[in-house]
A protein has these predicted regions:
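Conserved, well-structured interaction surfaces
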Residues: 13-89, 124-127, 142-151
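Aromatic-residue-lined binding/catalytic grooves and analogous aromatic/hydrophobic interfacial grooves
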Residues: 159, 168-173
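Short, contiguous alpha-helical
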Residues: 86, 165, 169
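TPR/Sel1-like alpha-solenoid repeat signature
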Residues: 74, 162-165
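Extracytoplasmic ligand-binding clamshell segments of periplasmic binding protein
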Residues: 150-158
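Short coil/linker segments at helix-helix boundaries
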Residues: 87-132
Length: 173
Protein backbone atom coordinates (compact mmCIF):
# COMPACT_ATOMS: atom_id res chain seq x y z
CA UNK A 1 0.00 0.00 0.00
CA UNK A 2 2.82 2.43 0.73
CA UNK A 3 4.60 3.16 -2.50
CA UNK A 4 7.94 4.99 -2.18
CA UNK A 5 6.51 8.04 -3.90
CA UNK A 6 4.05 8.49 -1.02
CA UNK A 7 6.65 8.06 1.73
CA UNK A 8 7.65 11.08 3.73
CA UNK A 9 11.37 11.58 3.51
CA UNK A 10 14.08 13.97 4.47
CA UNK A 11 15.60 16.72 2.38
CA UNK A 12 15.38 15.74 -1.28
CA UNK A 13 16.94 18.95 -2.56
CA UNK A 14 13.87 21.14 -2.46
CA UNK A 15 14.16 24.52 -0.71
CA UNK A 16 17.89 24.39 -0.14
CA UNK A 17 17.76 28.00 1.07
CA UNK A 18 16.09 26.67 4.21
CA UNK A 19 19.57 26.11 5.63
CA UNK A 20 19.96 29.88 5.91
CA UNK A 21 16.53 30.25 7.44
CA UNK A 22 17.20 27.63 10.09
CA UNK A 23 20.87 28.62 10.47
CA UNK A 24 22.04 25.07 9.82
CA UNK A 25 25.24 24.02 8.07
CA UNK A 26 26.59 27.55 7.83
CA UNK A 27 29.81 27.08 9.79
CA UNK A 28 33.36 26.91 8.50
CA UNK A 29 33.09 23.12 8.10
CA UNK A 30 30.27 23.30 5.53
CA UNK A 31 30.28 24.28 1.87
CA UNK A 32 26.88 26.00 2.03
CA UNK A 33 28.31 29.16 3.56
CA UNK A 34 30.86 29.45 0.76
CA UNK A 35 28.32 29.27 -2.08
CA UNK A 36 27.50 32.97 -2.12
CA UNK A 37 31.15 34.00 -1.80
CA UNK A 38 32.33 31.63 -4.54
CA UNK A 39 29.53 32.57 -6.93
CA UNK A 40 30.08 36.30 -6.58
CA UNK A 41 33.83 36.04 -7.07
CA UNK A 42 33.31 33.81 -10.13
CA UNK A 43 31.03 36.51 -11.56
CA UNK A 44 33.60 39.20 -10.70
CA UNK A 45 36.24 37.14 -12.50
CA UNK A 46 33.99 36.98 -15.58
CA UNK A 47 33.54 40.77 -15.53
CA UNK A 48 37.29 41.24 -15.01
CA UNK A 49 37.99 39.00 -18.02
CA UNK A 50 35.78 41.15 -20.25
CA UNK A 51 37.41 44.34 -18.93
CA UNK A 52 40.86 42.83 -19.50
CA UNK A 53 40.07 41.75 -23.09
CA UNK A 54 38.71 45.11 -24.29
CA UNK A 55 41.27 47.91 -24.48
CA UNK A 56 39.59 50.59 -22.41
CA UNK A 57 42.39 53.17 -22.55
CA UNK A 58 40.29 55.35 -24.88
CA UNK A 59 36.53 54.79 -25.01
CA UNK A 60 36.31 56.81 -28.26
CA UNK A 61 38.15 54.06 -30.16
CA UNK A 62 35.61 51.38 -29.22
CA UNK A 63 32.76 50.34 -31.49
CA UNK A 64 29.17 50.18 -30.19
CA UNK A 65 29.34 46.46 -29.34
CA UNK A 66 32.60 46.84 -27.42
CA UNK A 67 31.19 49.82 -25.53
CA UNK A 68 28.09 47.91 -24.51
CA UNK A 69 30.01 44.80 -23.40
CA UNK A 70 32.49 46.89 -21.45
CA UNK A 71 29.66 48.95 -19.93
CA UNK A 72 27.88 45.75 -18.91
CA UNK A 73 31.07 44.39 -17.32
CA UNK A 74 31.65 47.55 -15.28
CA UNK A 75 28.01 47.70 -14.18
CA UNK A 76 27.95 44.04 -13.20
CA UNK A 77 31.23 44.28 -11.28
CA UNK A 78 29.98 47.33 -9.39
CA UNK A 79 26.72 45.54 -8.59
CA UNK A 80 28.55 42.43 -7.37
CA UNK A 81 30.82 44.45 -5.07
CA UNK A 82 27.84 46.47 -3.83
CA UNK A 83 26.08 43.23 -2.89
CA UNK A 84 29.20 41.71 -1.31
CA UNK A 85 29.91 44.78 0.81
CA UNK A 86 26.35 44.81 2.10
CA UNK A 87 26.49 41.07 2.81
CA UNK A 88 29.86 40.84 4.53
CA UNK A 89 30.42 44.22 6.18
CA UNK A 90 30.25 43.80 9.94
CA UNK A 91 27.54 46.08 11.29
CA UNK A 92 27.90 47.59 14.71
CA UNK A 93 25.32 46.12 17.07
CA UNK A 94 24.53 45.55 20.74
CA UNK A 95 25.26 41.83 20.71
CA UNK A 96 28.70 41.30 19.26
CA UNK A 97 32.00 43.08 19.62
CA UNK A 98 34.37 42.79 16.69
CA UNK A 99 36.66 45.82 16.66
CA UNK A 100 39.13 44.05 14.35
CA UNK A 101 36.67 43.82 11.47
CA UNK A 102 34.65 47.01 11.90
CA UNK A 103 34.73 48.94 8.64
CA UNK A 104 36.10 46.03 6.61
CA UNK A 105 34.35 44.67 3.53
CA UNK A 106 35.69 42.08 1.11
CA UNK A 107 38.93 41.62 -0.84
CA UNK A 108 39.24 43.67 -4.02
CA UNK A 109 40.13 41.62 -7.10
CA UNK A 110 40.79 43.54 -10.30
CA UNK A 111 41.98 42.38 -13.74
CA UNK A 112 45.56 43.29 -12.85
CA UNK A 113 45.51 41.31 -9.57
CA UNK A 114 48.08 38.53 -9.86
CA UNK A 115 47.62 35.03 -8.50
CA UNK A 116 50.29 35.68 -5.86
CA UNK A 117 48.48 38.84 -4.74
CA UNK A 118 45.14 37.04 -4.69
CA UNK A 119 46.50 34.40 -2.31
CA UNK A 120 47.22 37.07 0.31
CA UNK A 121 44.46 39.58 -0.36
CA UNK A 122 42.96 40.85 2.90
CA UNK A 123 39.56 42.43 3.34
CA UNK A 124 39.55 46.00 2.08
CA UNK A 125 38.02 48.91 3.93
CA UNK A 126 34.42 49.50 2.90
CA UNK A 127 35.17 53.11 1.93
CA UNK A 128 38.01 51.92 -0.33
CA UNK A 129 35.72 49.46 -2.10
CA UNK A 130 33.26 52.25 -2.86
CA UNK A 131 35.99 54.72 -3.88
CA UNK A 132 38.21 52.35 -5.87
CA UNK A 133 35.67 49.99 -7.48
CA UNK A 134 31.96 50.71 -7.12
CA UNK A 135 31.74 54.43 -7.96
CA UNK A 136 34.46 54.41 -10.68
CA UNK A 137 32.88 51.33 -12.31
CA UNK A 138 29.43 52.92 -12.28
CA UNK A 139 30.84 56.15 -13.76
CA UNK A 140 32.51 54.17 -16.57
CA UNK A 141 29.35 52.14 -17.16
CA UNK A 142 27.30 55.33 -17.33
CA UNK A 143 29.68 56.84 -19.88
CA UNK A 144 29.84 53.68 -22.00
CA UNK A 145 26.08 53.05 -21.97
CA UNK A 146 24.93 56.67 -22.32
CA UNK A 147 22.40 57.07 -25.09
CA UNK A 148 21.77 53.34 -25.34
CA UNK A 149 18.44 51.68 -24.76
CA UNK A 150 17.91 48.21 -23.43
CA UNK A 151 15.94 45.95 -25.79
CA UNK A 152 14.37 44.16 -22.83
CA UNK A 153 14.23 44.21 -19.05
CA UNK A 154 17.10 41.73 -18.80
CA UNK A 155 19.71 43.97 -20.41
CA UNK A 156 21.64 46.58 -18.46
CA UNK A 157 20.56 50.11 -19.27
CA UNK A 158 21.61 53.56 -18.08
CA UNK A 159 18.55 53.50 -15.79
CA UNK A 160 19.92 50.44 -13.99
CA UNK A 161 23.29 52.16 -13.59
CA UNK A 162 21.54 55.19 -12.07
CA UNK A 163 19.65 52.89 -9.71
CA UNK A 164 22.89 51.23 -8.58
CA UNK A 165 24.44 54.65 -8.05
CA UNK A 166 21.46 55.65 -5.92
CA UNK A 167 21.87 52.54 -3.77
CA UNK A 168 25.58 53.20 -3.38
CA UNK A 169 25.01 56.85 -2.45
CA UNK A 170 22.34 55.85 0.07
CA UNK A 171 24.84 53.55 1.74
CA UNK A 172 27.72 56.02 1.82
CA UNK A 173 25.90 59.28 2.53
Amino acid sequence: DALPIFAIGGNIGYDWFAQWGTNEALGADYAVGALTWNNYYAWIMAANNVIKQIDASDFATLDATQKSYLGFAYAYRAMFYLDLVRLYEFKENNYTEAPGVLGLGVPIVLPETTEAEAKNNPRAKVDDIYDQVIFPDLDKAEELLSGSTAPDKYTISPALVYGLKARAWLKTS
